[in-house]
Amino acid sequence: MEIGVTQTIQKRLKNQDIHQPYEQTTELAFCWDTHLVKLGRRNVLLIANVSNRFMIAMMDIEPRNWKYYTLYIDEVISNAMKQIGYQEKEIKKYFELAGNIQITKSHGRKTLGAINYITQI
């Protein structure tokens, strides 16, 4: 699974290796882009699936918890899938097919455009 990060998040993930996206080899259903925005006084992490723009919002990540970024993303995606009706075995299969989490640069303009659109609503 690839988790694309914007420059805003790259600054918070100080010691993490950030790779180029592997668009040729990774199915886009297993790619997510993330961006941190300020809505009101709150930091909101927006997580969008690259293939279908399915969007998840996560609020108020404590500064000390950014070192657990990939664990949070994994858990949030799993919980969102449960909320929309996927069974536990289907979620487990999705994560098996997705493989290990790789932090990459974001996957392009379309997903980031969707994220920016959400922040303007």
Which residues does each predicted region cover?
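A short, conserved beta-strand element enriched in hydrophobic/aromatic residues
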Residues: 31-68
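Solvent-exposed amphipathic alpha-helical surface segments
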Residues: 80-84
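A short, polar/charged loop-to-alpha-helix boundary motif
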Residues: 63-79
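Short alpha-helical interface elements
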Residues: 46, 59, 78, 98, ...
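Short, basic/aromatic recognition patches
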Residues: 13-39
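Globin-like tetrapyrrole-binding proteins
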Residues: 1-22, 85-121
